[in-house]
């Protein structure tokens, strides 16, 4: 069962985003980026209070994903990418991105303790992930 409402176009958007942001980190890295995207749709805090769909999340501006600014994002989603997107839409979570709202690539500088006021929840390959504290009440 899906944790967010979606249509076929939005599954493809999420799949393309996951690939464009994290293909170099393999399928698990792509799933973690997908977690961040779905978390932003589910979150009721920070810059995400008015984000209610995958489409809004992918193209949020300001504060959205850098990958949408590059041609690679606009390639068709592959079947494997679509299957990965469907997994996170169904609610599968992958630590350290389980509740993360942000991630970034530190380019081997190490993960900062905080990013946009969120605490580091861990690193996977080239990406550092950042999640809100429970006291921020981001998730219903």
Language model feature labels by segment:
Residues 2-140:
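Bacterial extracytoplasmic/cell-wall-associated proteins, especially those involved in peptidoglycan
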């Amino acid at each position: 069962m899906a944790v967010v409402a979606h249509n076929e176009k939005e599954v493809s958007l999420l799949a393309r985003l996951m690939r464009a942001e994290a293909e170099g980190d393999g399928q698990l890295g792509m799933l973690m980026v997908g977690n961040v995207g779905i978390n932003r749709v589910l979150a009721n805090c920070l810059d995400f209070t008015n984000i209610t769909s995958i489409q809004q999340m992918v193209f949020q501006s300001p504060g959205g994903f850098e990958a949408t600014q590059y041609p690679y994002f606009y390639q068709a989603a592959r079947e494997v990418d679509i299957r990965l997107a469907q997994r996170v839409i169904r609610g599968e979570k992958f630590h350290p991105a389980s509740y993360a709202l942000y991630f970034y690539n530190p380019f081997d500088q190490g993960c900062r303790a905080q990013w946009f006021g969120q605490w580091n929840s861990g690193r996977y390959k080239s990406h550092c992930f950042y999640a809100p504290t429970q006291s921020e009440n981001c998730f219903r």
